[in-house]
């Protein structure tokens, strides 16, 4: 199958078959990551600009490593050392970068939908590394790969997501991707952090309690409280939040005995999850990070038209 998209902005835009292709390619890319010399010439001569208007550790570093392992030239730009601090608009920044002839711009931005705007302004490929509360497609893909690693499939699974659903781009990408692949999504969180109409996104059930959501779940994905996106306080305090929506050694038993626990990071230990669960046998958090490099290699590879991976 040929991947025909110039950009990867949202999993909503991709078909089930296209998602399967990206995951399959990522599985193959892991072989490169297991070598002593972790580099192939696939994107030699290509230039990738990582343009991050929001802070990031895992995603930015992972995209940089992914590009370098495919032999691309990678350039990192942060707002603190860009012309954005002098009032330059996103459109002008994009046009100036485009004049330097990059092949791919990987961007993270606080405004939802900013990548669609950027895509209309530039001719190179755009990959969304997170836009506001809209989507985070690479995180959704790496989560699906991590789940598939354990169960060998994605269809027929009960996936619980607990936390700040309203402000979570990870939640939206996972809902879009996992429901297309046949999983059932169960959501739990404070009513102030649950978006109205979220059930319309697919096979989604909003639960009144955390227990209802994670009861007999195959996968439990805990989400961070997005305080930087909340215009006002949406909960009394973190202790109260943890009491009702934190994952601990007792309530993790509500899920299936072989259930996997995941978190997109960064983790607030003692709030979303106790250290016992973070570091426990059911935790696949570091596996998510590991899979992130392979998934982002696959994304870069396909928006550049594919080719041979040697």
UniProtKB/Swiss-Prot annotation:
This is Aspartate carbamoyltransferase catalytic subunit. SUPFAM superfamilies: Aspartate/ornithine carbamoyltransferase. It catalyses: carbamoyl phosphate + L-aspartate = N-carbamoyl-L-aspartate + phosphate + H(+). Its EC number is 2.1.3.2. It is an enzyme of class 2 (transferase). Transmembrane segments: none annotated. Heterododecamer (2C3:3R2) of six catalytic PyrB chains organized as two trimers (C3), and six regulatory PyrI chains organized as three dimers (R2).
